[in-house]
Amino acid sequence: MTIKLIVGLGNPGKDYQSNRHNAGFWLCEALAHLYAGNFKKETKFFGEVAQINISGRKVRLLKPTVFMNCSGQSIQSIVNFYQINTNEILIVHDELDIDPGIAKIKFDGGHGGHNGLRDTIQTLGTKAFHRLRIGIGHPGDKSQVTNFVLHAPSKGELEKIQNSLNNSLQIIEDMINGNFDKAIKTLHTKE
């Protein structure tokens, strides 16, 4: 099994581009830059799509242009069109329960309160997809979460998040080729 679709979760528009909640977009944009892909608006997919080639494999990148809590609509449309199995999807998202500077790979599981994952699980009807969780840290109190994710990280936090994104870029090729154990071992030992 290989990864055919990488989805970066985030909110569309310039007002949100530097927010912690857009960490998924940041990784997809870095991948497009690294592998010479160009995002194009695809209204039928409710998103921006780029196609890249990694290790001789065609991989699509998707940044939904709907808000986070409607991400499933965008993902479902591209999955149906290209007949992609859910276990061939990697969803990249911000993770409150992981400190900045750390990224973790996970397969299956719940949404952990993440509205983008919640909608995706509900729309796809399954939790059986890969996740790349980019740590952004937690504000400390549940009542502060919305404000926290919808603001930019501090300079120090951003440096740590960028470091975890760079570490994540180094294991993408392994994930594309189905070497999940190697990718996990490599990424999880960079903490």
Swiss-Prot record:
Record site feature (Discriminates between blocked and unblocked aminoacyl-tRNA), residues: 11
Gene3D superfamilies: Peptidyl-tRNA hydrolase (3.40.50.1470)
Record field: catalytic activity: an N-acyl-L-alpha-aminoacyl-tRNA + H2O = an N-acyl-L-amino acid + a tRNA + H(+)
Name recorded for this polypeptide: Peptidyl-tRNA hydrolase
Source lineage: Bacteria, Pseudomonadati, Pseudomonadota, Gammaproteobacteria, Candidatus Pseudothioglobaceae
Family of the protein in this entry: Belongs to the PTH family.
Stated role: Hydrolyzes ribosome-free peptidyl-tRNAs (with 1 or more amino acids incorporated), which drop off the ribosome during protein synthesis, or as a result of ribosome stalling. Catalyzes the release of premature peptidyl moieties from peptidyl-tRNA molecules trapped in stalled 50S ribosomal subunits, and thus maintains levels of free tRNAs and 50S ribosomes.
Quaternary structure (record): Monomer.
Alphabetical UniProt keywords: Cytoplasm, Hydrolase, RNA-binding, tRNA-binding
